[in-house]
Amino acid sequence: MVSLLRTLFHAATGRSPKLVCNSELWSRGVDELGRRTEDTHESGAFLLGELKGAVRKIRQFLFYDDVDPNCFANGIVEFDGSKFGLVWDKCRTMKMSVIADIHVHPRGFAQSPSDRQNPMIAEIGHIALILPDYARQSRMPGAIGVYEYLGSRQWRDWSGAGDRAFHVGWWPR
């Protein structure tokens, strides 16, 4: 009940998070990311959804290796840029867009130099999430990496903002 009241208060006062996902979808998607790591390599997904005002609502996980089966061949995310056409086709078919991305690290949730230099979607405002520990333990805002792309390979770190930046659960808009 406290969570619902806090959500309604934030919505009513115009303090919307940048990104939201319902609990069931988040749990299923994160479980699948953890499974796909096989505890040996990274995994990741494009987060498809829609922009509602200033809030990005996640509606579906599109796993990197479903689009590019070889993207984890070296243990880290190395997505073949020629496969982006398949991503855009899926977005058109589903009437959604890539509103964020997520990938899994073996340990912490800090961005690696490669993460900072190579955004999956190099668009200002794009959100990149990083789950630590192969998605086995920490999986909720406040314990995961939340990064907003500012352009020119610069990022804003929202990781410490908890659900003020990324909210998992019901959201009214």
Residue ranges and their predicted role:
Residues M1-V98, R107-R173:
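Conserved beta-strand-loop surface patch within small alpha/beta domains used
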Residues V104:
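Residue-level "edge-of-site" marker
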